[in-house]
Amino acid sequence: MKLQFTKMHGAGNDFVVLDGIHQQIDLTPAQWRALASRHFGVGADQILIVEKPSRPDVDFRYRIVNADGSEVEHCGNGARCFVRFVTDKGMTDKRSVRVEVMNGVITLTLQDDGQVTVDMGAPELEPARVPFRAEGLPTRAEGADTLYGLEVNGRTEWISVVSMGNPHAVQVVDDVENFPVLQDGPVVEHHAAFPNRVNAGFMQVQDRHAIRLRVYERGAGETLACGTGACAAVVAGIRRGLLDSPVRVHTHGGDLTIAWDGGAEPVRMTGPATTVFEGSIDLAALPA
């Protein structure tokens, strides 16, 4: 059986996008991993699946599978590619679509200049709902935020915790390019305080409207960009009194613009979505 796919990226965060409405998709965890493999499959940070909605008030359902075969709640860069995909494929003629994700509904809008704005919803800041186990950890206040001290490779690192539909730990660093992201990222991801693991973000504040960001993503490793990570970093920076909305987030894969008015207001992310190529892969070539 041939599986049709489209390869896309959002600021260098790359995806295999599958139309699950017009073809049957039933892959094993090993097949998901092989499809995402850059040596044995197509190669991607994550795999996005377009499906029919399960409720009448949305246009599509959106599923995300990590490169390690685990399914996750949300992906902001993937959401931008999602709306570009369904628009280019003629699956909708709407400029703005409502999409069902694992834990809610998001609104995606295709702008006239080709950029995509995603209404990411309000951030979740209650530690237990991230989820994050704060008991027994040292804390300190900074602005409106509470920072938590984690032991990471023999050092105490102070983090903010934010959920953008998926869990994030955000650390402010002086020089993000030379920070040991590949060494610290896995330690933070698997820290016992995060029962569902966590995406580890490392941001350098350039001015009140600009940051540089690297993210070690849960189940994927460091990626060129992370949309939900950019949102979480900006929320943390605003709450700590370091940033003002809107904020330009510079990643290795490109720039994103994040806006948040605080409190229960939604976070809005704007950035590119690019189609690279289309193809098909023989499922028999993937391990079962």
Swiss-Prot record:
It catalyses: (2S,6S)-2,6-diaminopimelate = meso-2,6-diaminopimelate. This is Diaminopimelate epimerase. Pfam families: DAP_epimerase. Belongs to the diaminopimelate epimerase family. GO terms for cellular component: cytosol. The record marks H168, E217 as: Could be important to modulate the pK values of the two catalytic cysteine residues. Homodimer. The active site is at C75, C226. Catalyzes the stereoinversion of LL-2,6-diaminopimelate (L,L-DAP) to meso-diaminopimelate (meso-DAP), a precursor of L-lysine and an essential component of the bacterial peptidoglycan.
